[in-house]
Amino acid sequence: MRVALLMGGVSREREISLRSGERVKKALEKLGYEHTVFDVREDFLKKVDQLKSFDVVFNVLHGTFGEDGTLQAILDFLGIRYTGSDAFSSMICFDKLVTYRFLKGTVEIPDFVEIKEFMKTSPLGYPCVVKPRREGSSIGVFVCESDEEFQHALKEDLPRYGSVIVQKYIPGREMTVSILETEKGFEILPVLELRPKRRFYDYVAKYTKGETEFILPAPLNPSEERLVKEMALKAFVEAGCRGFGRVDGIFSDGRFYFLEINTVPGLTETSDLPASAKAGGIEFEELVEIILKSAFLKEGVRV
């Protein structure tokens, strides 16, 4: 099997993608798969036809282009098989506003509004969360407890993104649920509870060793664990996700509040999905092989 490994990319998550890609590359080498690395940059479209000579594309491009449905649509058009969700599901999950509207009534979502212009005070009161519609790795996310912090968040995000989501802050326990697709169906890995040393699970907390305590499995009673897993899988399936992914949310007062779906989650040494896989008895090389094989679970290319 010939594997094209796509890493890097043009988004603000480029460095994380390179870290994920290097780790996947080493795993492919250990597994004995013939592979070629593509460090995706602005000129990638000139080279995309080269991918036709490979059996499958292993996509570890985080953020815009690689995770938002753009790459997936190109690969579908060219008839190239790839890991992860299709273009439609990727688009839905990358844009949080679209995700919330699409999943409304399916899972419980904290109150939210879209803001396109500067405001002096939060329409949802405090504390609240300000975040971009289309971004990953908690880039551009602010937890605000005052007008001053809220105004600062808008001044940072509005010029860059044009519009932002303001969401009610739910105090509780941060949970992430990783899901793999195998021949037997969807496998839900052990629920991971995140206890960041910082204010919340931001970029630094995600990718710096020692900044976040991983509790695996999350200390939940059987009914709580069942609820968290059921709600996460419900969101994943409703959004049409495939292959592998991660569902993030807040567990508070016996309820699971959905926050987002990551269709190309990080695979670095500090990432959530590999940690959950290991807790479930799946070492990293096996995880990579499961993700790779999931691309072949449907005949032809996803449509």
Curated annotation (Swiss-Prot):
Amino acids binding Mg(2+) 1: 248, 260
Reaction catalyzed: 2 D-alanine + ATP = D-alanyl-D-alanine + ADP + phosphate + H(+)
Residue ranges annotated for the ATP-grasp domain, each copy included: 99-293
Positions annotated to bind ATP: 125-176
Gene3D superfamilies listed in its UniProt record: 3.40.50.20, ATP-grasp fold, A domain, ATP-grasp fold, B domain
Top EC class, one word: ligase
Compartments reported by the entry: Cytoplasm
Functional pathway: Cell wall biogenesis; peptidoglycan biosynthesis
InterPro entries in UniProt: ATP-grasp, ATP_grasp_subdomain_1, D-Ala_lig_Van_CS, D_ala_D_ala, Dala_Dala_lig_C, Dala_Dala_lig_N, PreATP-grasp_dom_sf
Stated role: Cell wall formation.
Sequence similarity: Belongs to the D-alanine--D-alanine ligase family.
NCBIfam families in UniProt: D_ala_D_alaTIGR, PRK01372.1, PRK14571.1
Protein known as: D-alanine--D-alanine ligase
